[in-house]
Amino acid sequence: MNFLLDQSTDARLVTWLTKRGHNARRIGWDYPHGLPDHEVLAIAQREGRILITDDRDFGELVFRHRQPHTGVIYLRLASYSFALTTARLEDVLAQHADRLDRFLVVTPGDVRERRE
């Protein structure tokens, strides 16, 4: 799978995803740092990448402004430790692979699909 990580996410996730056979790129490394959110979402859409972010503003772009996307994984994790993040992503990739083209909200105990 192809992923784009927002600049606010832990940079170690690129290596973590790559070691699992995925193609992962990150804003701030592979693309300029500080891109506006709408440009980040447009890059992901253009390149067919699933966006991984912890920035809730992407929900507004998708649902309020109807910006197209190829999937968003919104990490809504209070303690944002790397171990928790990777454990939750492992669950998402294993249990929700058929829903990765949607807007998924990932919390410590749940994965839900956000709709309008």
State the predicted function of each range.
Residues 42-44, 68-71:
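Short, hinge-like loop/turn segments at secondary-structure boundaries
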Residues 5-6, 53-54, 77:
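Small/polar loops that bind or transfer phosphate-bearing groups
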Residues 2-50:
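N-terminal first-folded block
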